[in-house]
């Protein structure tokens, strides 16, 4: 059976928080498992914050912290730091039309082969 060439997982957060819930940990386990199966893969971790709350400065800080936390959890699960590309968009970019869903860190892992 051919493995997927990429996976995408969203880790959602409560407003103003950077604590990962049980569902988020499950998604990070899936990303880590994919990374172990695909040793040439890299994972892009991008943190976001919703536009509906906080100032741009606060949202930048929250989104960056969310990306940091997700990166740390992937490293704990055996993903090498040099295989993780991390960024944050604050509230400048909104990946979802539903404001509440933009309290998220999106992980996209792609195999290079």
PLM-predicted stretches and their roles:
Residues 1-42, 82, 96, 100-113:
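Periplasmic peptidoglycan-binding/tethering modules of Gram-negative envelope proteins
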Residues 45:
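Conserved phosphate/oxyanion-binding catalytic-loop motifs
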Residues 25, 48-113:
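Periplasmic OmpA-like peptidoglycan-binding domain that tethers envelope proteins to the cell wall
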